[in-house]
Amino acid sequence: MFNKIVKEFQWGNHKVRMETGEIARQASGAVLLDMDDTVVLATVVGAKNAKPGQDFFPLTVDYIEKTYAAGKIPGGFFKREGRPSENETLTSRLIDRPLRPLFPEGFYNEVQVVIHVLSINPEVPADIPALVAASAALAVSGLPFNGPVGAARVGYKDGQYLLNPNRAQLAHSDLDLVVAGTERAVLMVESEANQLSEEVMLGAVVYGHEQMQIAINAIHDLVRDGGKPEWDWQAAPKNEALVAKVSELGLADLQAAYQLRQKSARSQKLKEVYASVAAKLAEAGVEADGVEVDNILFELESKIVRGQILNGEPRIDGRDTRTVRPIEIRSSVLPRAHGSALFTRGETQALVVATLGTKSDEQIIDALQGEYRDRFMLHYNMPPFATGETGRVGSPKRREIGHGRLAKRALIPVLPKEDEFAYTIRLVSEITESNGSSSMASVCGGCLALMDAGVPVKAHVAGVAMGLILEGNKFAVLTDILGDEDHLGDMDFKVAGTDNGITALQMDIKVQGITKEIMQVALAQAKEGRLHILGKMQAAMGHARTELSEHAPRMITVKINPEKIRDVIGKGGSTIQALTKETGCTIDIQEDGTITIASTSSEGMAEAKRRIEGITAEAEVGKIYSGTVLKLLDFGAIVNILPGKDGLLHISEIANERVNQVSDYVKEGQMVRVKLLSTDEKGRMRLSIKAAKAEEGDVPATAPQAPGAGDATSQQQ
């Protein structure tokens, strides 16, 4: 019934098993991959024909985590998986990026890749198995695909590279780098690093590419024994006559458009050229598909821009290959925000805002490997007006989530540890103008906003987006690329870091001829650009502000006996709720007895601290307290000296003379000074007004003058 093909291989410390032919047989391709109990199912379905008028490649990649993979039931009312989590979105992008460039030009058939996580080993992240399984599923499907693709995660500790480190190793690693590529070339890099050098980063990329060959070879074996016949697909032949005609009608105007340095003027001119060519073709009686004409014009644009750069001519905006666009920086832009910065680089601009919160503001993430809390959030938004367009405004798209994550990776290594700066931090980057490199503008603006908020970052962090154009043996590396250069180039990569090293590196490579030497040149030029931007940032803001904004919460920490936590919380939370409401403070209690009090009011914090210390204080024998008389008894009175701490004031301890009536000396609600004489094994306390007055040097208490009072005194003496 099943033609099941299985391939097993050892990959570093992991045993991997790939199989096809048993599950999801109606898909174009399906592979089940097991990597030390992390199991993923990757499926591929490709449409046999492209839709009429299709002018782009409709590839979708969906990475889906099932909670049963971790033996859990989803939370919420409906008890089933809902919208994709941030991790699912980021992993979908991670898989998409190296696969997309390997489909042939002109292939516009719809392709859907779906990866389900069916079982999770908490120590083995599922992203690498998912990427390898997706590549294998495409390879066995027979679709036109220039793969297979391999992938590997690389760590770095004590001068050694680690292959596919587990989560415990990653927690202590100075590097978390994912690299994907084919047998011959690297296609994608995504990484976070603890200020590592360009040499170490490039070495990690090369090491990962070497180690992924094990997985690529296993995929070849799987295809040889279990692959489906290759599709009989051929790209449509080029209409050379149409290419020549479009070139004749539009080339000169396109060249003129690319002499315009301002993006808006250039974009408008290009639209006019496209419309003009279409109109002239119609006038000439040339029948042509509009999509085909647009593609020819785009190819002409690409040749113009690439040719100018490779010939040493100025770039689109007039710069040479190494120059960073003009930078303008302004901090404290928003009066009520805790920290803010406006970072402008050419026609790219980011308004980044920092907000400080308490531990209760941390994001709680219910991941497959277990719940954890995140004290640093970075959210990136790019509304359509940033590019002078109209469009949908709403929940963030995949691109926005990915750009936010990249900027976050760049800043994490310089953040202070929680015991140095206990605040929860949220950065929001609002892209108000975009012409390339908006994620790196978010890094620069984010660092400045943190410093403006008074966050003691370890160093300035800057980011720069780089491009590369390769034709045969000629290549050019571009610093601080524009949006058009991004689309027309062969590689774009983003590097962020400090004066000391790289904190984040992202590469996307569209061709397979880029060597280690070319990447070395590109990284060296990126460092030059990064240091230039860092110089501008350091001149604008040399260090973090020493004082927090007056609108930011202040925090103090109180340590109590963990057994007293219930007293602070109170029955049904009554005590903590009253404290929060009456003092206007946010109060967070940890299991170890650490209490954090946060408020914009120093008076409110002081009052909350005083009351918490009162609730949790231990009564000390021999200490004098101001107490409140709660109840009178025939033989004395009950006095409250601390919250929840009542003691007996015996009649003999009220005054030196004989006391006949307790009410002659103290009243309910009266404040009295009492000394704690002793506490028995049951916690019962003996109090004394006599001893307190004697120690403090006051005149001994006497009863109010009343009939018989003098006799009582003489009798006691």
Swiss-Prot record:
InterPro entries: ExoRNase_PH_dom1, ExoRNase_PH_dom2, ExoRNase_PH_dom2_sf, KH_dom, KH_dom_type_1, KH_dom_type_1_sf, NA-bd_OB-fold, PNPase. Its cofactor is Mg(2+). It is an enzyme of class 2 (transferase). The keyword Nucleotidyltransferase applies. CDD domains: KH-I_PNPase (cd02393), RNase_PH_PNPase_1 (cd11363), RNase_PH_PNPase_2 (cd11364), S1_PNPase (cd04472). Transmembrane segments: none annotated. Mg(2+) binds at residues 486, 492. It catalyses: RNA(n+1) + phosphate = RNA(n) + a ribonucleoside 5'-diphosphate. One of its GO terms (molecular function) is magnesium ion binding. Its main location: cytoplasm. Residues 690-717 are annotated as: Disordered. It comes from the Bacteria. GO terms for cellular component: cytosol. Its EC number is 2.7.7.8. Residues 553-612 form the KH domain. It is found in: Cytoplasm. Belongs to the polyribonucleotide nucleotidyltransferase family. Involved in mRNA degradation. Catalyzes the phosphorolysis of single-stranded polyribonucleotides processively in the 3'- to 5'-direction. This is Polyribonucleotide nucleotidyltransferase. It comes from Ralstonia nicotianae (strain ATCC BAA-1114 / GMI1000) (Ralstonia solanacearum). The gene is pnp.
